[in-house]
Amino acid sequence: IGFIGHALIDLSWGGIPWWSWVITSAFVGIVVGLFTQKLHVEEGNFNKKKVGVFALANVIANLIGWIVVAPVLDILIYAEPAKKVFAQGVFAGISNSITAVVVGGLLVLAYTKTIAKKGSLDKE
């Protein structure tokens, strides 16, 4: 979703997708997905341990993606100046980590509250 969403947003602004960042969005999504697939939030349980794993996965994925992957791809694909892209990467990594943990965490928590727990329904 990150790959498609990022590419479509770039296109909707009337430009050409910035492929290094589109690829990084996909990388972050894959890493977070691999980390969090075993949390089983679809069962309606998002306890402190799961919140911690979710937060850690997002921070690790975003920091590696935006501080390493995106700047390196910017340099390789677009010949951008290293100092500029690594500075952008640090800002993006930190801001995306905070956003993903806070907004993403609240969305997952809200989602788990909508799920009926096993055995919570009585047969009449």
Where are these regions (language model features)?
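Interfacial aromatic-anchored transmembrane helix boundaries in multi-pass membrane proteins
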Residues: 2-38
